[in-house]
């Protein structure tokens, strides 16, 4: 007889009502992420304010890393870790203000069951829309 003990399965997180989760995929280059962070913060303020006007809260799925100084998801591994904490049926906002690599969030997006809204800035100096469409 086996003595193997199966691990407990953690319950899926559940989103509070009228709450959307926000993610932002970054670049592979930390210098690009650091340089574009202020523009990303501005975009996130606009998105959060628009949701608030309609009675919704927006929760950033991951915080700002004190070591890098930005809150971009900057690797596939990080993307998997961030998406593990997002309720799978929650509304999700993918907000992009700079160049980014979609593969950082692709695995999480593939398994996410809730609605997904993609938003980007349209500025000549920071190509969020180009990053989003690319």
What are these regions (language model features)?
Residues 1-134:
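Metallocofactor- and cofactor-centric catalytic cores in central/energy metabolism, strongly enriched
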